[in-house]
């Protein structure tokens, strides 16, 4: 989408019934030029027909591309003792960073589609059933024959803080650029795309290059190890939500003060991002965007239920808020509240 087309789209979002003459007057261009731009927007699928109905207004859905897996979580009854058996509670659920973000957004009321890879096993079927029960469209699933579905194992202390985790996400490597090209119409029609860095670098690069210029792409680094995939490769992404350690890796600097945090976020913005949201655990959230706005959403003391899921719920609230067109002053408190539910 060209810059002029973006300007026209913004005017039509505000008033879909604007005439070509009025659009031309507001932008200071000729009416015939407006007609050409509108025709191009129609060919690209951004405008559906009379009244300049925007495709994004027909169904403002989110597409998630990334991990959906079985979560095995253990939580000790007392402080953890390393190298010993700890009495506790063990549960199984469907998880995965992108899945969790999508489920949270879906439960908030957003239309959501998920593109992921699962094995042809009972776990894969469980993932599909639970996604559908949450209101997530699973037509984009790739079922890898002979492979096991992804499994994530985490161990938490008696306060709910994660001590260590292990993951087996090999099936996710079966997602390919060719497979995603077959989902082009779904991706092209999205209002926002969500990805996580558990994806192969080739997939992350393809989504950023093919869709990032027109569709906001939200990316979660997932971990310090996976965050390295984004270092120096942020162009094409709209929003990144790192924690403090991941932000240090992305910005290639140590962060020990508020001033250094602002500097690090600024470095990431300079690489092409529209906004950076750094989660700081109990300290809250720091937000910075391309327009120069810098905001803090302070944390409040609370009992942590699951530190792993809280960040995913926050991202779900962030993407949902984007669909609603909310300003950051409303988005951040909403997303923080979502992370505490």
Question: For each of these PLM feature ranges, what is it?
Answer:
Residues 58-59, 80-88, 107-191, 213:
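Conserved N-terminal subdomain of the carbohydrate kinase-like
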Residues 89-97, 142-146, 308:
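Active-site nucleophile and cofactor-binding loops and adjacent substrate-binding regions
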Residues 105, 243, 311:
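Short, conserved phosphate/pyrophosphate- and ester-handling motifs at nucleotide-, phospho-/glycolipid
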Residues 192-263, 283-285:
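Conserved beta-alpha-beta core of the PfkB/ribokinase-like small-molecule kinase fold
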């Amino acid at each position: 989408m060209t810059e002029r087309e973006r300007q026209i789209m913004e005017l039509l979002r505000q008033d879909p019934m604007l005439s070509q003459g009025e659009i031309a007057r507001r932008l200071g261009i000729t009416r015939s030029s407006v007609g050409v731009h509108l025709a191009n927007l129609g060919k690209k699928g951004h405008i559906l027909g009379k009244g300049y109905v925007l495709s994004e207004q027909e169904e403002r859905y989110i597409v998630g591309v990334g991990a959906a897996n079985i979560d095995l979580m253990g939580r000790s009854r007392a402080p953890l003792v390393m190298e010993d058996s700890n009495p506790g509670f063990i549960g199984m659920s469907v998880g995965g960073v992108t899945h969790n973000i999508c489920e949270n957004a879906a439960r908030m009321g957003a239309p959501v589609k998920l593109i992921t890879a699962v094995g042809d096993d009972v776990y894969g079927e469980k993932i599909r059933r639970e996604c559908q029960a949450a209101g997530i469209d699973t037509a984009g699933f790739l079922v890898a024959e002979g492979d096991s579905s992804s499994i994530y194992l985490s161990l938490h202390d008696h306060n709910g803080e994660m001590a260590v985790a292990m993951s087996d996400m090999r099936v996710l490597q079966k997602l390919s650029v060719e497979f995603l090209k077959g989902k082009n119409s779904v991706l092209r029609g999205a209002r926002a795309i969500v990805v996580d860095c558990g994806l192969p670098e080739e997939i992350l690069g393809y989504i950023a290059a093919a869709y990032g210029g027109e569709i906001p792409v939200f990316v979660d680094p997932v971990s310090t190890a996976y965050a390295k995939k984004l270092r120096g490769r942020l162009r094409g992404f709209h929003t990144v939500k790192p924690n403090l350690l991941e932000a240090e890796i992305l910005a290639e600097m140590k962060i020990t003060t508020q001033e250094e945090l602002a500097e690090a976020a600024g470095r990431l913005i300079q690489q092409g991002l529209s906004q950076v949201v750094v989660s700081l655990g109990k300290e809250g959230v720091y937000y910075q965007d391309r327009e120069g706005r810098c905001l803090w959403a302070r944390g409040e003391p609370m009992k942590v239920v699951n530190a792993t899921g809280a960040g995913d719920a926050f991202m779900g609230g962030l993407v949902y808020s984007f669909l609603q067109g909310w300003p950051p002053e409303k988005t951040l408190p909403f997303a923080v509240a979502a992370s505490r539910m």
